[in-house]
Curated annotation (Swiss-Prot):
One of its GO terms (cellular component) is nucleus. Residues 305-549 form the START domain. Pfam families: Homeodomain, START. Probable transcription factor. It comes from Oryza sativa subsp. japonica. This is Homeobox-leucine zipper protein ROC5. Residues 98-157 bind DNA. Residues 61-77 have a biased composition (Basic and acidic residues). One of its GO terms (molecular function) is DNA binding. Residues 95-106 have a biased composition (Basic residues).
């Protein structure tokens, strides 16, 4: 039986009860009420409490208290007497000693109290009130009964532990005496004659102790390496043949493992042959050379830097085992979801807790869990190409630019075995985002571990290191307004298929603090549509489809009224990607861009509108001056697909876009990024206000998949776009993006299953308020961009007939 927090005031993790049955048959303790005034506690166990009580009276009280404690609950009788009798005894004029009246509990009351105590040793106030009402007891009686029962349990447990320790002590004393007797008359084990013992120096004793410790550590490391490498390692195998100039000295005191180059090359001579595969620059038994681990420029948190890197490896292996099992297991771990649910299956958390040990510790109080699994085919050469993308932080963040605000490799703990990604281990830090100012960024520090499961099959797992630094509050604490988040073993399992595709099974399991998330977005996050496996896999499929089209010789171009070369199309797509990345950075307020929030200078702007400013001096691709960004999110009672088609239609932009000059826009060219309608990059031309004014060009990128959609656009100069369309460098083309992010509003359970009521629309604008970087931001500029957002949202609702 497990009593969580029984002996530590209710706040600890609890302990395992060491006995097969409880202590219900043992005599209960007779405990008194403690009172700060000292007047009540002295009277609870006897008839008098005055200073003149005799020794005989004290003996009588002790005898009575002992008799009163015969039942499992009789130690609460004193509490029943703490009513009106206490008031009478407290009066100074009452010198007559009276015997305390005890109210004993009935067997039924004791049975009910004991039954609840076995289920919950620490009942809350509501449970105590219900029990007192049901048993016709005072609430204080129930409260102090549980207090005394816990004290009794603790005391009896301590007595039992003391008895065990005493037995162990007696046993050690007996062994010590036996050894002393044997040392007085030592005998030779070979011939049986008396032996003469030589003196052993203190230094030799220390060396023997150190040798035993190193041997134990070597056994542990070899067992770990056997599991890591997937092949047995013999402790008696000789080290590989090394060149004379690569001979390695012995360590001074401890076994420093050079996993990922952490321990240094000086310790490799103590390891068995196959363990050299962890080290850098040393030949392995297979004849290959292992690339040494590299140190990154990012600063490693001090508390993380103090952790032994072999602990990282143990955590990564445990997380990998959990990921593979979660990707392969079905019912009862994964059960079918309700009809209409965004996911086909949901995690059975009760079965999960029975199947896996929490490798990063128990879920903190107040956290909620979200777990999802999704499988699908991805257009990619092979699974190894996807592994290379996931293990490179830059390519990973580019692939999921709408979800990853910032990614950094803090340390490359292990580069893998034999120059491959098998066994590669990275310590990373990332900022995950939802394109809305109402959802804080999730900042997480985690390990990313890669393993080859079979030929053409790989797995990449992420796991937070919070469990390793859980005793330090600042070890991986989020910064700024970011939300607290823990990444339970999550990742993907990849398998090559004969038709040129790669089957990917994605598992996402996260624990986070929901208190900082806006009520509007909580259903979305709980359903897994914001950070779940469905969104990761849908984004991966869309991006890989786009890359496949770009790598093909025939890029699909629709409505091509302007001839664009292949180089021009690539340059135009590169510019559109930069535009979308800048748009996402302006919405999420990531630390990747130097945005400053204007919390106290926004005047009458609503709390759901985030306003930020940034000074651009000489950054390529941005106009110099003070840039103002404003974003907000609203609920629109329109299906996400309908809202997306309305916003991307150039013929309908006059209904909401002030850049259209009140008329329809013309699509000059369109580059398709996928087979699904809506994934494209377009160049639009707005109608000229007058004959003397040249028309404006607008670059627009639209993306959509099963998880959501975005529409991003920015005005561009005509000469700059002519250069880009001719294949020129788009790095220095200045633009400030604006646009929309569309997400489903999260499923709600209706009469026939899950139902979706509308869309969550995020509107964001970036405008140049002053072309002088040193200029100060004015209140008028802030109000202007706020009015622009409000007016745009109102026009969209009016056009969709949902402004009521």
């Amino acid at each position: 039986m497990s009593f969580g927090g029984l002996f530590d005031g209710g706040g600890g993790g609890g302990m395992q009860f060491p006995f097969a049955s409880g202590f219900a048959s043992s005599p209960a303790l007779s405990l008194a009420l403690d009172n700060a005034g000292g007047g009540i506690g002295g009277r609870m166990l006897g008839g008098g409490a005055g200073a003149g009580s005799s020794a005989g009276g004290a003996m009588t009280r002790d005898t009575e208290a002992e008799n009163d404690s015969r039942s499992g609950s009789d130690h609460l009788d004193a509490i029943s007497a703490a009513g009106e009798d206490d008031v009478e005894d407290a009066e100074p004029s009452n010198s007559r000693k009276r015997k305390k009246r005890y109210h004993r509990h009935t067997p039924q009351q004791i049975q009910e109290l004991e039954a609840l105590f076995k289920e919950c040793p620490h009942p809350d106030e509501k449970q105590r009130a219900e029990l007192s009402r049901r048993l016709s007891l005072d609430a204080r009686q129930v409260k102090f009964w549980f207090q005394n029962r816990r004290t009794q349990m603790k005391t009896q447990l301590e007595r039992h532990e003391n008895a065990l320790l005493k037995q162990e002590n007696d046993k050690l004393r007996a062994e010590n005496m036996t050894i002393r007797e044997a040392m007085r008359s030592p005998m030779c084990g070979s011939c049986g004659s008396p032996a003469m013992l030589g003196e052993v120096s203190l230094e030799e004793q220390h060396l023997r102790i150190e040798n035993a410790r190193l041997k134990d550590e070597l056994n542990r490391v070899c067992a770990l390496a056997t599991k890591f490498l997937g092949k047995p390692i013999s402790l008696l195998s000789p080290p590989p043949l090394l060149q004379p100039h690569l001979s390695l000295p012995m360590p001074n005191s401890s076994l420093e493992l050079a996993i990922g180059g952490i321990g240094g090359l000086g310790s490799l001579g103590t390891l068995p042959g196959c363990m050299n595969e962890f080290a850098g620059g040393v030949s392995s038994p297979m004849g290959t050379v292992i690339t040494p681990a590299r140190a990154t420029g990012a600063a490693i948190p001090s508390l993380v830097g103090n952790i032994d890197r072999s602990v990282f490896l143990e955590l990564a292996i445990s997380a990998m085992d959990e990921l593979v099992k979660m990707a392969q297991m079905d019912d009862p771990l994964w059960v079918p979801a309700l009809p209409g649910s965004p996911s086909k299956e949901v995690l059975n958390f009760e079965e999960y807790l029975h199947s896996f040990l929490p490798c990063i510790g128990m879920k903190p109080a107040g956290y909620v869990s979200e777990a999802s699994r999704e499988s699908g085919l991805v257009i990619i050469d092979n699974s190894l190409a996807l592994v290379e993308t996931l293990m490179d932080e830059r390519r990973w963040s580019d692939m999921f630019s709408c979800m990853i605000a910032k990614a950094t490799v803090l340390e490359e703990v292990s580069t893998g075995i034999a120059g491959s990604r098998n066994g590669a281990l990275l310590l990373m830090k990332a900022e995950l985002q939802v394109l809305s100012p109402l959802v804080p960024i999730r900042e997480v520090t985690f390990l990313r571990f890669c393993k080859q499961l079979a030929e053409g099959a790989w797995a990449v797992v992420d796991v937070s290191i919070d469990g390793l630094v859980r005793d330090h509050n600042s070890g991986t604490a989020p910064t700024g307004g970011n939300v607290k988040c823990r990444r339970v073993p999550s990742g993907c399992v990849m398998q090559d298929t004969p038709n040129g595709y790669c089957k990917v099974t994605w598992v996402e399991h996260t624990e986070y603090d929901e208190a900082s998330v806006h009520q509007l977005y909580r259903p979305l996050l709980r359903s897994g549509l914001a950070f779940g496996a469905r969104r990761w896999l849908a984004t991966l499929q869309r991006q890989c489809e786009c890359l496949a089209i770009l790598m093909s010789s025939a890029t699909v171009t629709a409505n091509d009224s302007t001839a664009i070369s292949q180089e021009g199309k690539r340059s135009m797509l590169k510019l559109a990607r930069r535009m979308t990345e800048n748009f996402c950075a302006g919405v999420s307020a990531s630390s990747a861009r130097e945005w400053s929030k204007l919390d106290g200078a926004t005047g009458s702007i609503g709390e759901d509108v985030r306003v930020m400013a940034r000074k651009s001096v000489s950054e390529p691709g941005e106009p110099p001056g003070v840039v103002l960004s404003a974003a907000t999110s609203v609920w629109v009672p329109v299906a996400p697909e309908k809202l997306f088609n309305f916003l991307r239609d150039e013929q309908l932009r006059a209904e909401w876009d002030i850049l259209s000059n009140g008329g329809p826009m013309q699509e000059m060219t369109q580059i398709a990024k996928g087979q699904r309608d809506g994934n494209s990059v377009s160049l639009l031309r707005a109608s000229a206000v007058s004959a003397n004014q040249s028309s404006m060009l607008i670059l627009q990128e639209t993306c959509t998949d099963a998880s959501g959609s975005i529409v991003v656009y920015a005005p561009v100069d005509i000469p700059a776009m002519q250069l880009v369309m001719n294949g020129g460098d788009s790095t220095y083309v200045a633009l400030l993006p604006s646009g929309f992010a569309i997400l489903p509003d999260g499923p709600r359970i209706g009469a026939t299953g899950y139902e979706t009521g509308g869309s969550l629309l995020t509107v964001a604008f970036q405008i140049l308020v002053n072309n002088q970087p040193t200029a100060k931001l004015t209140v008028e500029s802030v109000e202007t961009v706020n009015n622009l957002i409000s007016c745009t949202i109102k026009k969209i609702k009016t056009a969709l007939q949902c402004d009521a």
